[in-house]
Amino acid sequence: MHLSELSHPNELHGLSSSELEDVARQIREKHLKTVSTSGGHLGPGLGVVELTLALYQTLDLDHDRVVWDVGHQAYPHKLITGRFNEFHTLRKKDGVAGYLKRSESSFDHFGAGHASTSISAALGMAIARDRQGQNHKCVAVIGDGALTGGMALEAINHAGHLPKTRLLVVLNDNDMSISPPVGALSNHLNRMRLSPPMQFLTGSAEEAVRHLPFMQGQVPAELNRIKEGMKRLAVPKVGAVFEELGFTYMGPVDGHDIGALVRTFQEAHRSEGPVLVHVATTKGKGYPYAEADQVGYHAQSAFDLTTGKSFPAKKPKPPSYSKVFGQTLVKLCEQDSRIVGITAAMATGTGLDLLQKAVPDQYVDVGIAEQHAVTLAAGMACDGLKPVVAIYSTFLQRAYDQLIHDVGIQKLPVTFVLDRAGIVGADGPTHQGQYDISYLRCVPNFTVMAPKDEAELQRMLVTGLRHNGPIALRIPRGSGEGVPCLEDGWEPLEIGRGELLAEGDDLLIVAYGAMVAPAMATAGLLQEQGIRATVVNARFLRPLDEALLVPLAKRIGRVVTMEEGCLAGGFGAAVMEALHDRDVLVPMLRLGIPDQLVDHASPDESKQALGLTPPQMADRICERFGSAFGDRLQRQTLSV
């Protein structure tokens, strides 16, 4: 069967192991070809090809439910659920999403993008099934990295107390989440993987037998029986932790042996209660470069399949904000042993991998445990350390109670660096950093700021570390503005003071963070039409520089705010409230993300769709205030 002919996963029923292996080969070829061209998650999907095929051969996907944790490993799932012919549009605007979306396919039973949610969702489906007298199967597929998340453990604890509720949890254990997983549970799983029977199961012994001249590529049944016996005898406590929590434990199973997987899943489906099947896989399986560098090939931009190297940029780019942050933090840590960098399993993405290599004693990775990361930092701050929590804007949402209860209320000096703040692009709505402005500006005692460029980022980091209270700094995804960075001697900013960048009498533009450069470009376009704008780099969301903004708004009489975040409760709303409280009631235009989700596309495409490019913003300003500008407006449409 050719993969392109597979329109429904139930068509896998009845295929032999060799036929499934041929489908697996085609999936890997398509997966590699597509990701090498368009970019995307590489290693996770390559590691679960056989797992996916074997699982789906034992299910009826018209009725049964499968919840994939995170969803970045579900490319094989997409390829066998009718999206083969559209797969070349992966992560592109209006194309196939990089994660699971209920709106994209009836086979995407639960959407995701964040880790550790699958067991809770699948258990909820199982309870709904039982209450409605139905009989379909409910399955959660979760990686060993996501299993470190507290939510996953909460769900396991709950499911274990429901002995009559049929639930299958498939643990995809590749000893890798994005960065290597940490913690006692991960260490326990690792001991399982490194036990002699497990090494025999997944190591070179079977391959050596298969290649003996007289074996003709086959493995005798006796060897399989020996392997199973060794597992039972030498690793009797492998699943003890899950058995104690109320699950029937099966495994470990070779995650690339389709026959063994099918037999195990069939046995698991016969159980009357919760079952955990432990599957040992290799992240990046089938592509040597991805197997050798499982962190580097977790996700990739477009790359050369032959060499495994990313294609060079068409023109040199400035360093990313993440890299500038990481390099600066390393230097600050070298100067002050009290500074500690904390990540929640995202060291590479946030730039903290640089700290891990340079000053490992001042680096902490808590795993996928954002709530713990925040309160851990609070505890450190209580006793004299200077914690810096580097975390994606979208993931900090998961620790909101800790921000308020453990840090804000107690006014503890913790510095938060929110990476990927604003529009992030192809990862789509689960990863857009569009909410942090709104959810941070109301937290008591917090100072909130955003830099206009790399050099200002460095100064803000120093500001945070010298401030005796909680402070949050948001930085966008991608390259900086190309402003030279200082090697040392960074001066802190005066908290609550903005920066006047340009002066004009017709319009006041107040921009925040990544929107400062577009604001200046917009002002330049307006200047060409005879409109002179004052431009302010707000720097601080909380506290706002009311001493600067109020007199300017009162004098100029027309205000535009620009932000890369939600308009609801956002930066523009903060400016409007501040002016209103001072009885400055002037016409305003707030530019940002309206009340909608931002779907997957490139950042530039998303900004175009939202009307946030400089030509579009200039046009919107002219439409809003055109009559007030009178004869000075040399009207022409700038956005095309």
Swiss-Prot record:
GO cellular component entries: cytosol
Cofactor: how and how many bound: Binds 1 Mg(2+) ion per subunit. Binds 1 thiamine pyrophosphate per subunit.
Molecular-function GO terms, alphabetical: 1-deoxy-D-xylulose-5-phosphate synthase activity; magnesium ion binding; thiamine pyrophosphate binding
Binding site for thiamine diphosphate: H72, G113, H114, A115, G145, A146, N174, Y287, E370
Assigned EC number: 2.2.1.7
Sequence positions that bind Mg(2+): D144, N174
Catalytic activity: D-glyceraldehyde 3-phosphate + pyruvate + H(+) = 1-deoxy-D-xylulose 5-phosphate + CO2
Cofactor: Mg(2+); thiamine diphosphate
GO BP: 1-deoxy-D-xylulose 5-phosphate biosynthetic process; isopentenyl diphosphate biosynthetic process, methylerythritol 4-phosphate pathway; terpenoid biosynthetic process; thiamine biosynthetic process
One Pfam family here: DXP_synthase_N
Keywords: Isoprene biosynthesis, Magnesium, Metal-binding, Thiamine biosynthesis, Thiamine pyrophosphate, Transferase
UniProt superkingdom: Bacteria
SMART domains on file: Transket_pyr (SM00861)
Gene3D superfamilies linked: 3.40.50.920, 3.40.50.970
InterPro entries reported for this sequence: Dxylulose-5-P_synthase, THDP-binding, Transketo_C/PFOR_II, Transketolase-like_Pyr-bd, Transketolase_BS, Transketolase_C, Transketolase_CS
SUPFAM superfamilies membership: Thiamin diphosphate-binding fold (THDP-binding), TK C-terminal domain-like
Complex and partners: Homodimer.
Family statement: Belongs to the transketolase family. DXPS subfamily.
Protein name: 1-deoxy-D-xylulose-5-phosphate synthase
Species of origin: Synechococcus sp. (strain RCC307)
Annotated gene: dxs
